[in-house]
């Protein structure tokens, strides 16, 4: 659109929000507000017209409503969508990225999220569990037979269900990881 500081918020966004907020002709808004000023300056008018304001604050999570994308996973296709979104939004813009590492990360995320979705209790289906699993994936260069807690989880799941979606993804990940050791 235009450069930062050129008046988009003041002359375009805020007038449109205030003009469109009407009880007679209600519309919904999704607004990116990096400075937090738009909500402060337009919230009163929106609330007066019956709007419910929800805020996702990625800087201060204590001031944020919570959103758990795991709650929207219903099948393997949804797992793949979440992984693709996660990868796209955490990519380093200045780096082309090595396709091998990106594919390995995608396989690992797919396996772990698949495990969480199909095997974890509902209250553990979240990014906290994913991070805990990632943090417990210790590798010992001097001991090729060492198995970390995540390896053991997948071994146990494979014993029960050898063709489980998460197991298949984890085996592909381990195969790729083994190709570089």
State each model region's role.
Residues 106, 110-181:
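Non-catalytic, charge-rich alpha-helical accessory subdomains
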Residues 1-113:
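Switch/coupling segment of Walker-type NTPase motor domains
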